[in-house]
């Protein structure tokens, strides 16, 4: 049966190719031409049969009672000859040169003359090219040409990145109906409804005179019951534009009653207010006004999670519910990498052990990736100018800092500091660290970067601590750690820098210290239950967690060897002690660990 299908498909492809080549030859040789399309000062010889087969518009025209002379020469008004030429060639060859400069014109013309094959190719192209800079224009095009597939794709793209896109100038130029099509969407990726309200009011103020009259209609798409009541009183009720609009004031009164627990009776004739949404508490027939909608947006399912990134996958762990979620596959992420999460909740992975066997001059590479939270994919960024390992990572104002480490080629200790600017998309060097160091740790807090411990050129552990101010561009010494160490865990927890475990001059350590940023003093904390190196510390939602690392474990041969452990511990602040949570979480093997906020709505439970 399969062989028969394969034969049938082979014959179909052969016949299609033969037919396409034959049609192309007939056009080029101008054989059997029976009509001409005229656009501007250009004429395009064609075949009625081909045009009719590819377009309902032309089929109806050529089958109509129009006199024969008009069918032979068809004048097309307001048509760009160059665009028409591309479309005609596609009909005969199934090949078209689409680019950002011509796709919208080709799309519009194929829509006008009902040529679905060209139309579909344009839609697919535009869907693949969606970006923050063009998504609103593509949304507008999809709505204008009545193409639901394109409009929905663009709207979902905007919804996923609403916080970013609502700040764009294009957003301020949306028509009322275009704005409504965006903000009425359940899948809007906002953690707070306040973001939607502020975006709408900024849109209104961009053209206050004309848009204030549309406010009532747009108002219906904002889900005020999802706001904090205090915010509603301070920012919505007191807004000058809202106070001066009698129609909106009526709705404000209803909302005030709703916050007090008194909802109006659902009405079968109540308008949806452009939202197309039904209140979750009532049936399909009994509707509340759109501005009383209390269905959470998709972005409101965000939760604080521990992200474990290794060379197989990025898995999010919820310590409160003891659940794991697949965030992204990570086969391109090297082992022994470092990772960081920025203040804007952007996850980056830097470095790791990767050997490019095809590159004879520089076989060792330090790659750089960013996690796209929307597509759950890793985006490649410019790699480090020179490969290094055992470095520290910091972040200030969305810029990533790679501090010191070891050169992968020469194994020399480094004091250089690299800075990645995401706007310029390039690396540059900033002020060197005062000493060459590797195996240290770096943490960022309140616009400053802290570099702690590590090993110096003489392979001895240091207890020195430095602070870097990116605005001043200088490093300064802070109070040294009590115990010199390298390969330890670090986290900012309740306003203090906490470090745990690591390697000291005497071997593995279980000691824990905390640095008070206000007093510039170190204090001893409760020891970790086991001596470990490379332990990960994560402060999440007010709790401190310790994950994995390497410990000296006795083997069957009775010898002790460094062995990776993949357990999770929690520090109980009130009792000042460590409590075991999980004996093993396999996703922690070879993983870097981060505290991040992820949307459970987009994750798959493992």
Swiss-Prot record:
The family database entries (Gene3D superfamilies) matched by this protein are listed as: 1.25.40.420, Kelch-type beta propeller (2.120.10.80), Potassium Channel Kv1.1, Chain A (3.30.710.10)
Q: Which PROSITE patterns does this entry report, sorted A to Z?
A: BTB (PS50097)
Q: Which GO terms describe its biological process?
A: myofibril assembly; proteasome-mediated ubiquitin-dependent protein catabolic process; protein ubiquitination; pseudopodium assembly; regulation of myoblast differentiation; regulation of myoblast proliferation; regulation of skeletal muscle cell differentiation; skeletal muscle cell differentiation
Q: Residue limits of the BTB domain?
A: 33-100
What top-level branch of life does the organism fall under?
A: Eukaryota
This entry carries the following GO cellular component terms, namely: Cul3-RING ubiquitin ligase complex; cytoplasm; cytoskeleton; endoplasmic reticulum membrane; M band; pseudopodium; ruffle; sarcoplasmic reticulum membrane
Annotated compartments = Cytoplasm; Cytoplasm, Cytoskeleton; Cell projection, Pseudopodium; Cell projection, Ruffle
Q: At what positions is Phosphoserine found?
A: 3
What does this gene product do? Involved in skeletal muscle development and differentiation. Regulates proliferation and differentiation of myoblasts and plays a role in myofibril assembly by promoting lateral fusion of adjacent thin fibrils into mature, wide myofibrils. Required for pseudopod elongation in transformed cells.
| Name used for this protein in its record | Kelch-like protein 41
Source organism per UniProt: Rattus norvegicus (Rat)
| Gene of this entry | Klhl41
